C-alpha cells in the first residue's frame, strides 16, 4: 500500500472514531457540546489520531483497540486549541480557516467546550474495548503528555518567554513540551493498543519528540513565508510581538536546514529499531518537513 492510500485509511478510521465519540459523549442539545463538536470536527491534519492507528498497525495491533485512543488524543488536542485561541492566551480569531471557537460561541462557552473535550477524552479511554492494562497505559500517556510535565508546561514556558530573547535550548524545551509531549502521547497510546515492549516505546518516544520539533520549526517558518489563506490561521503575530522563534533565530534557510538535520536523525534512529516496518512513519515525518500548511 502506498503512503497516500495508507494515510487516507488511517484518516478515515480517525474520522469515524471522532464521529462515534461525538455521539457517545457530546449530546447535540447542549450548547457547550455543540461548541466542542465545532472544535473537534472542524478539519485539521489529525496527525495525532493518525499516529495512534499507524503505530498500532505497525506493531500488529487491532485497529478496534486503537479507535477510542485515537479519538481521545484528538479530543484533548482540540481542547488545547480552543483554549489557546482565547484572548487571554494567544488571542487568535481564526482556526482551520474559520472563526475560532470563542469567536463562534463566545469566550465562556469556548472555555467550557475545552473543559468538556479534556474530560471526555479520559472517559473515551475508560470505555475503550481494550484490556484494562492497555487503557491504564493510554490514560497515563495522555495525562503525562497533556499536563504539568507536558503540554500545559510548554504553554506556560511559551508565555514566559513571549517577550524575551529565548535561546535555541529554551525554544527546544518549550516545544518539546508544548508540541512534542502530546505527539509522544499519541504514539505511546498506539503502542499500548498493540502491547508494545519497553524498547519499542523508547524508540517511538524519540521519534515523537523529533517530529514534534520538526513540526514546530516548520510552523515558525510558515508564519513568515505563508498566507492566512494557506495556513487557515493568522500569520505574523510572533514577529509583531517580538517573539523569538526558530525563524527569527536562524532565518528561514537556517531554520529549515536545522529541521532537515533533525528529521534525518529521527528517521534513521526509528529505522534501526523497526526496519522496513517504519516506512509509513518515516514518510509522515518527511511530509511534516515539507508541508505548506
Language-model regions, residue ranges each:
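N-terminal amphipathic/basic leader segments beginning at the initiator methionine
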Residues: 1-22
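Mg2+-dependent prenyl diphosphate-binding active-site environment of isoprenoid biosynthetic enzymes
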Residues: 6, 22-270, 277-289
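Short cytosolic juxtamembrane segments of multi-pass membrane proteins
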Residues: 291-293
Amino acid at each position: 500500500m502506498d503512503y497516500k492510500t495508507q494515510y487516507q485509511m488511517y484518516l478515515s478510521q480517525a474520522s469515524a472514531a471522532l464521529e462515534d465519540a461525538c455521539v457517545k459523549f457530546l449530546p447535540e442539545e447542549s450548547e457547550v457540546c455543540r461548541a466542542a463538536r465545532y472544535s473537534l470536527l472542524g478539519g485539521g491534519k489529525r496527525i495525532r489520531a493518525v499516529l495512534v492507528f499507524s503505530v498500532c498497525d505497525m506493531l500488529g495491533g487491532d485497529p478496534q483497540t486503537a479507535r477510542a485512543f485515537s479519538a481521545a488524543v484528538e479530543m484533548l488536542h482540540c481542547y488545547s486549541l480552543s483554549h489557546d485561541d482565547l484572548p487571554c492566551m494567544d488571542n487568535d480569531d481564526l482556526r482551520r480557516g474559520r472563526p475560532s471557537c470563542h469567536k463562534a460561541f463566545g469566550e465562556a462557552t469556548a472555555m467550557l467546550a475545552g473543559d468538556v473535550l479534556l474530560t471526555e477524552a479520559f472517559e473515551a479511554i475508560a470505555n475503550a474495548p481494550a484490556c484494562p492494562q492497555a487503557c491504564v497505559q493510554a490514560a497515563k500517556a495522555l495525562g503525562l503528555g497533556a499536563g504539568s510535565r507536558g503540554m500545559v508546561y510548554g504553554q506556560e514556558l511559551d508565555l514566559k518567554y513571549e517577550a524575551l530573547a529565548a535561546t535555541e535550548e529554551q525554544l527546544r524545551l518549550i516545544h518539546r513540551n508544548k508540541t512534542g509531549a502530546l505527539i509522544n502521547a499519541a504514539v505511546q497510546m498506539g503502542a499500548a493498543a498493540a502491547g508494545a515492549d519497553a524498547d519499542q516505546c523508547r524508540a517511538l518516544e524519540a521519534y515523537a519528540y523529533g517530529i514534534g520539533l520538526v513540526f514546530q520549526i516548520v510552523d515558525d517558518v510558515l508564519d513568515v513565508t505563508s498566507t492566512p489563506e494557506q495556513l487557515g490561521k493568522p500569520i505574523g503575530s510572533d514577529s509583531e510581538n517580538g517573539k523569538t522563534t526558530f525563524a527569527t533565530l536562524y532565518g528561514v534557510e537556517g531554520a529549515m536546514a536545522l529541521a532537515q538535520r533533525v528529521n534525518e536523525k529521527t528517521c534513521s534512529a526509528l529505522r534501526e529499531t523497526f526496519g522496513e516496518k517504519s516506512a509509513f512513519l518515516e514518510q509522515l515525518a518527511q511530509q511534516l518537513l515539507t508541508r505548506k500548511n
